[in-house]
Each structure stands twice: as C-alpha cells, then as structure tokens.
Amino acid sequence: MSEFQLVTRFQPAGDQPEAIRLMVEGIEAGLAHQTLLGVTGSGKTFSIANVIAQVQRPTLVLAPNKTLAAQLYGEFKAFFPNNAVEYFVSYYDYYQPEAYVPSSDTFIEKDASINDHIEQMRLSATKALLERKDAIIVTTVSCIYGLGSPETYLKMVLHVDRGDKLDQRALLRRLADLQYTRNDMDFARATFRVRGDVIDIYPAESDLEAIRIELFDDEVESISAFDPLTGEVIRKLPRFTFYPKSHYVTPRETLLDAIEGIKVELQERLEYLRSNNKLVEAQRLEQRTRFDLEMILELGYCNGIENYSRYLSGRPAGAAPPTLYDYLPADALLVIDESHVSVPQVGAMYKGDRSRKETLVEYGFRLPSALDNRPMRFDEWEGVSPQTIFVSATPGNYEAEHAGRVVEQVVRPTGLVDPQVEVRPALTQVDDLLSEITKRVAVEERVLVTTLTKRMAEDLTDYLADHGVRVRYLHSDIDTVERVEIIRDLRLGTFDVLVGINLLREGLDMPEVSLVAILDADKEGFLRSERSLIQTIGRAARNLNGRAILYADRITGSMERAIGETERRRDKQIAFNLANGITPKGVVKDVADIMEGATVPGSRSKKRKGMAKAAEENARYENELRSPSEITKRIRQLEEKMYQLARDLEFEAAAQMRDEITKLRERLLTV
C-alpha cells in the first residue's frame, strides 16, 4: 500500500512541532473537532502536511474559493510529489441555472460552459479516492453538491487484465456504455480509436497518458500506457481500470427502473395540476418530461439529467444527495482552511437553491423530485463530516462552539513578528497615505490599501495615479484568473500599490507587501469587524518591515480587540525570538507558485522547460540590442510571434512574449 511521503528540506520550527504533536494526539484520541489557530505566515499548510504524513489518512482539504484552493493544491503537490494530490472544484467556467420569474413570465434556460481540464481533474480525484489510501483532495464548497453515487459509478467501471478473453465488439460496446465516443481522427479525452486489433483509449480522468490494448484472437495480448501526443510507449501494464466519462453514468437496468418511477410521479403530478385548474403548467410539465424520458431511453442521458438524481441513485424522497463525501473512506480526515469563511458558506448554499427550484416545480417546469437535486443541508454535512481540523487565524463562532481542542501556532519559523499597528487621524488620511507610499516605493516594497466602498476605491486609485503612483484596483467584477494575475503583477513589481475593498484578506500570499493601510477603520461593520481587521493586518506579516496603519478618528471596540490581539501575538513572538536567539528573516517565495498546476490545461513539463529555455535565449539576445531601430525591429518580430502563439492557443507562451515586449518598450524610452 502507498504511504504518504512528505518531501521537504524544512524542519518544523517555532510553534510548529508542538502544534503538529497536539493535532496528531487529538486525531489518534478520536477528537471530532480541533482548531489550528495559526497566524498569517506561520506555516499552517506545512503543519497540516506533517500531520497527514504522521497519521497516514486520506484527507479532504476544504478552501473558501478557487484561488485559495489552487494555491493549496500547488503547495500540497510540492510536499507530496509521490502521492495522489487532486483538485476538485466546480467545473463551470460560466453557469446560469434554469430559473423562472413569474412576475414577467420569463423562463431562463440553463446555460453553462464546462472547463474540460477541471472536469478531468474531478474524475481523477474520485478515482484516487476509490483506488488509493494516499490521496489528498483539495476542494471548495462544490463538494457538498450532488454527484453520481459511488455504488452506481463503480458498477460501470471496466477492468481489463492481460490474458483476458475479450471480444473486440463487446469491448467497444462497454466503452460506449461509459459514454466514450469513437473518433479515429481527433484523439482526445474520453474517446477511443480502432486500428485492426489495436484499440487506443484516452481515459476520461487522464491528462497525459492514453492506454493501448492489443488483441490477438480475442485475447488481450498487451496493455500499455503511451503518450497520446508522440505515440511513445511509457510502460507496459498488467491490468487497467477504465472509469466512466461522467459521475452521472448509470447502468441500463437502473435507467429503465428510473424511467418507470419518473412516469409514475409525472402521472400523479399531472393529476394534481389539472385538478387545481393549472392546465398550462400541466401541459408544459408533460411535454418537457416526456422529451427528457425519450432522450434517456435512447442516449442514456439528457440535458438536466441531474434533476432526476433521486431515481438514478435509488434514494428515498428528501434524503441527502450523494456527494464527494460518499467517496471518502471511513478513516478520512477533513481540513477546513480559513474556516471562519468556509463553514458559513456550507450553510448558505441550500436555501438559495431551494427557493429557485420551488418556483420551477410550482409552475410546471420540473417534477417535485427535482428538489432532491440539491446541495447538502448544514445538518447533513455535519452528519457525514469525518474528524475535522479547522484552520484559521480568526476562528468563527462555530469553531469556538465545536473546538474539542484549540492548538495555537503564533510563532513563525522565520522569526517574523506581526506588523506594528499605528492609528492615525482619518482627516488627512489620503495625503498621509501618499507620503507613506512614496517611502515604500523608494525601497521597492509594495502597499495594500483597503477602502469601504467601490466608489471610494475608484476615486483613490485615480488620485494616486494622478500623483505618479503605479496603482491598480481590485474589485468583485474581476474573474478569478485575472485576480491571480493582478496579484502576480504586484509581486513582480509591475505596479506598487493595490487598492481593494474586501478582496485583500484570507490566504493571499504576498511577502513583498510591507504596508497595509486601512482607511476609515472606525466605521463599524462587516468590513471593519475584529476578524476582518486582523485578517487585513495579517497581509503585511510576511515582510520584515511589515506595518499596518489604521486611519480613524476614534478607537472602536473592534479596533481595540484587533490591535490587542495583534500586540499579544507580537509580544509572544518577540519573547520567543529573544529566548532562542532568532533573527527574523524575510520570506522569499517564487512568484510562479501562486496557481502552479491548477490553471494550465494539459501542461507538460517538457513544454515548460522548452519555454523557459526560449525565454533565457530571448533575454540574452535582448541585452545585446543597442540602438532604438534594433529594439523597434525586435518588438515587431516578437509581436508577430505573440499573435501566432495566441492563434495556436499557446496562451502561456504568448503571455511570456507580452512580458518581453513590455520590457523592450520600457528600454526604448531610456535609450
């Protein structure tokens, strides 16, 4: 059996050894809940990695959003390169659920765009849980939404062993049952191609390997894994298991039983609607449902098949839907990162989904059984959650009520102490901020500024830009990937100041930031609560010269508690450093770390090495350019290459070219 192998050059330090020991003790003692109260930059992820390596249990890591999930995925992947670290988040790039607005008689059709790469990673995650004990799944709140039941899913898997008697046509039929399609021209995920007695199959959950089955006289002579791009055989295999293309694939007999159940419910619902003189709703429901039934009968699925999940999973009315938690082994561990945000998210999902579906049922767009296609309720989630570790710098009320043990991790391994907190008058906050920014920019450090409203953030950004500050504004309309790019550019020094409202808090890892400025800190409310203030102050805790300035005309209760807690932690950290002769060291972290491994579909290490080599050669060549005409000519050449790469969908390489062009244009101004 595979074991978790933690690969790192670091040893636990500061508060980490004691925190790891206490958490492992708590898990082995059977504590249902523990809280790791760890300050920003104290290495909470490293401590959790050590706990996983010691207890040797499959682990589900729940993050509050995709950005943090991607960051955690990259970190765990680096800690456990020889184990199954997987990424399970919503596979929708865009999702518009079906809805009905009775006031305007408007029906909105379901519309969605599925990210193929994330769908592959989700399938890979469930496969890892079913096949291996050494699995770490990094997920978001999407893990509480309905998924095909593991029992049905496992009934559909196809095992092929070398030496098996296997009729070729029977094999192709089984692959079709798994919703794989034959495509001899375009060999992609969840497709297969046939060349005589050789069948190439690209598994739905695989990113870089396809499987070749060679038959001789209806016997499996050879099974091998090969690179679908080059055709190079990677290794020979004694056996292989093929999983369905979707978690919702269902055996034929279950589908036939489900169709009968749906017909019975449809008849009952039609009688109810007609008896209440809702003839339009009855006609609409009958037409839509019979169309779905016909599709299921012919193709094995239909658009919106998840609305019939009660029948497909065989669960009684009102029962909790099958979710990712059903795939977890009994001895699994649950780690909830930034639990003060993640736990309330779990509770919020059910009610919004319910009210939308009740309208659809009432007006004849769906059968009442569609209400069972839903996320888990909070009490159901509590019932299926395994042993749990809450991780947060500012635990919420739920954690306080359920914490069997609170483990503090206040002292950082680097010796860094919490930032100094100053309170300054709000009357002159903008001018004072401008002078502080000038000081930080002079020593190549970065600044975060948090305001109360969008309007205020926009006005401040314009004002700073007018005074020659390189500034950007981060707001809720910016999508996840662009947000990550903005944070990356801040760290790289493309600009110096980032202004935001509520997006500069949990988990963002920016060691270059030495100043956090909180405007109007005395305006009590959600954005200036004790928890929000501590989290925002913590953004400067990874820098040796970290400082937080709160602009306020009075000290509120939240400010007093936040400053008091920061001072308590700071005093403890300084005392530990003095007692152990530790000199604080700044954090140095590779900028490429932010979303490594979770955003680039089908990325191959060879391709990345080639791109890095090309970038080095470009840099050498560009340093030799002297005259403005040479630089201008080079810019034109690179622009042509960049547009060609974009046309070839090589966006990562095109982005590198764009960065090179920007540098050359800056040089052109100084030549």
Curated annotation (Swiss-Prot):
Query: Ligase: is it a keyword of this entry?
Result: no
Would the keyword DNA damage be found if you checked this record's keyword annotation? yes
Q: Identify the stretch(es) annotated as Disordered.
A: 601-623
Q: Where is the Helicase ATP-binding domain?
A: 25-412
Record domain Helicase C-terminal: where: 429-582
Q: Where in the cell is it found?
A: Cytoplasm
Quote the Pfam families the UniProt record gives.
Answer: Helicase_C, ResIII, UVR, UvrB, UvrB_inter
Q: Which residues form the UVR domain?
A: 632-667
Question: Where does it mainly reside?
Answer: cytoplasm
Q: Which UniProt keywords apply?
A: ATP-binding, Cytoplasm, DNA damage, DNA excision, DNA repair, Excision nuclease, Nucleotide-binding, SOS response
The record's Gene Ontology cellular component field reads: cytoplasm; excinuclease repair complex
PANTHER family given in the database record: UVRABC SYSTEM PROTEIN B
UniProt-recorded name of the protein: UvrABC system protein B
